């Protein structure tokens, strides 16, 4: 499962989604986690209500199931959720490695319902039909 982190320093969740310089992306499973990429953003990143800066960030995280942020605006959160990504706001800057370790431990046990749903993001839905349903007798 891919997880995205809004960060200014690549080691902590410490950035507002809209003005994050970097989105760090990791793959996490019950067996471990692996750094995949850091997507850098330049240009105007001020917290100014300019929604145009969100497009490239949403594109960068489109395959992620969860996004960790220090803060996120209402419209940004709505766009993240509409992309089937679960945003999580940290109360204070937190080390990405610490979050990954906690997430890995939860995945190894019994994940809460919201996390089980997030884990299904990239899984194709299995559709099965009983033979009886296919008969139009």
Give the location of each predicted region.
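Non-catalytic interface/targeting segments
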Residues: 1-56, 63, 88, 93-137
């Amino acid at each position: 499962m891919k997880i995205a982190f809004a960060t200014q320093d690549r080691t902590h969740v410490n950035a507002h989604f809209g003005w994050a310089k970097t989105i760090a992306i990791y793959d996490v499973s019950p067996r471990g986690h692996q750094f995949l990429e850091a997507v850098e953003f330049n240009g105007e990143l001020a917290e100014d209500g300019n929604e145009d800066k969100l497009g490239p960030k949403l594109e960068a995280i489109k395959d992620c199931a969860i996004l960790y942020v220090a803060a996120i605006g209402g419209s940004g959160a709505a766009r993240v959720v509409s992309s089937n990504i679960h945003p999580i706001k940290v109360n204070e800057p937190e080390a990405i490695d610490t979050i990954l370790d906690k997430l890995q431990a939860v995945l190894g046990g019994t994940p809460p319902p919201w996390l089980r749903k997030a884990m299904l993001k990239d899984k194709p839905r299995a559709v099965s039909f009983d033979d009886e349903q296919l008969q139009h007798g």
